Amino acid sequence: MFKNKWFVGGFIVIITVTLYYSLSTELPFVERIERSREDYRQNILSMEDSPIDLDTFEHFEYFDPNESFLIEGKFTASKENETFKLMMTDSSTNDIPLAGTAELVIDGQTVKLKVFDEGETFLLPFNDKTNSIKTYGGGRYINIEKRAVNDDEITVDFNEAHNFYCAYNINYVCPLPPSENNIGIEIDAGERTYGDHQHD
């Protein structure tokens, strides 16, 4: 990754390591989540162009692991070569391949969320009712390994939700979750607000 961009480069290193634990079925649920978070911490802090200010960093804040936010749902693939114009925090747009739509039931509410194809993984950016209160105001994202999608089924673990780099450093340009991915309930899972950066 290089400064002022979000969709490129070294971020794949973090994805690869953390997703190893996120999809491991051999570890107990809580241990798997805790290991994944620790690997995320170690990798983002060791990045050559880390968005974290190492002089002031203390720790990341997370909700406690909650298996009720590990959700299996329906997946509808998009048409071949279909793209979506994703708005960025600097008012620019980024054309990104649209992988499809995930239909999930969360706390009794059915939501249909757009899922994007980043090459190595799928990307699910979202907003929810915790924004600017318990979590970063600009929304969060989940990276989903492609093997978590099986034909018309998808597994989404909101415990793996992380802040966009803009939550750590205003010098980064990040995607804004599309309006279709606004979830009308609180997702008390994944990463919480970082420091005082509640708004994008």
Segments predicted by a language model, with ranges:
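Short extracytoplasmic/periplasmic juxtamembrane "stem" segments immediately C-terminal to an N-terminal membrane anchor
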Residues: E34-E48
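Hydrophobic membrane-insertion alpha-helices, especially the h-region
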Residues: W6-S22
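A mature extracytoplasmic/lumenal domain signature
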Residues: F75, D117-G119, F126-T130, F158-H162, ...
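Mid-length scaffold segments of soluble, non-membrane domains
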Residues: K79-R140
